[in-house]
Amino acid sequence: MLSEDEKEKTPPSVMTSIPDDVIMECIAPRVPRYNHSMLSLVSKQFRSLVASPRLYKTRSLLGCTEDCVYVLIEDCILEVARWYSLNRRTKRNMPGTVENRLVLISSLPPMPTAASYVVVGSNIFVMGGRYDWNVEEWEAQPPSSIALCIDCRTHTTRLVADMPVGLMTNVSKVIDEKIYIVGRVWASATIVEFDLRTEKWADGTKPGWEADDRWLTSLSTTAGRGPSSFENNCDHKLMEDILMDKEEIKHYHLFDNECVMGNILYVYDRHKYILRTYDPKQRTWGVVKGLEKLPLGGDESYIVSRGKMLILFLIVVLEYDDDASFQKRELWCAEITVERREEGEIWGKVECCDLLLEGGLIIGSCLVVTL
């Protein structure tokens, strides 16, 4: 242990002597976000800088933004739902050290189940759902009307105005700076509207929308869960077209969710354990070939796109039980690159496939936030 005299003689760290402007403009924006926690250990100066909104503005101007994957894991044994972040595969977390890939965000509080989770910029809005895990009391108690906002830059939360009515089993969509949420109150379906500019609620509907079970069981691109590259809400029109196709809609109970990448819709078919595609220009369905390395038996799935890569989360149930908390479940994550070959077929390559967690797990949500 250093004496007081020795402490005074100890020269300051080279890093802490660097001006803030140099750190903010030249160093920190280029450091991958998964290394920010290590960077913040250097000094209090760095801790304040990596949490600064200015850093993320600079990252955007320099083209150094990243697509960060957030996964909500519901633990049926502990009866808690918590957010995790998925780190990119690096040399430090190659096979054998996958626990470094899925990181619990300890600063965020437990989350509700069956809620609406909506990405807007660097924020995640959490609306409605259930905080009580006692299913037997759900018929007697209405869903929560609490709404909060998660700032993904600092991993902090703040409350926003309560919903006019508590909803659960929600789907949602951001249109014209408003969040439209369709959910159930008891057995009936209701649509509510949240204005992002004023952060106030109002009863409202969108032309052509109907508050019925079709929307509650529709694909999540309609709900705004998956990143979309379609312009002018074409993804919404695409989903309407698909939902009107009676031949295809009969299969939707087998699809958990989907995402759009490169104007192609990708959805995991948990009945046949294959990754399906939908081409809106050709109006045809297809199958991604070359994915034999995926673990079989994905009983639940979530798929998102990060850059030019698909991230597929699979829950594999090894031992079945009516109560999920007594099931032996594994959470797998596969990173898949895809390419369209000359004959028009889409082929995929499994870049990595890791077992992340085990236990009585359910994937509550999976979102991509650009930071």
Curated annotation (Swiss-Prot):
Plastid among keywords: no
Sequence ranges of the Kelch repeats: 123-165, 178-229, 257-305
Keywords: Kelch repeat, Repeat
SUPFAM superfamilies from the UniProt entry: F-box domain, Kelch motif
Keyword presence, Magnesium: no
Domain F-box: 13-61
Protein's name in the database: Putative F-box/kelch-repeat protein At3g10510
Organism: Arabidopsis thaliana (Mouse-ear cress)
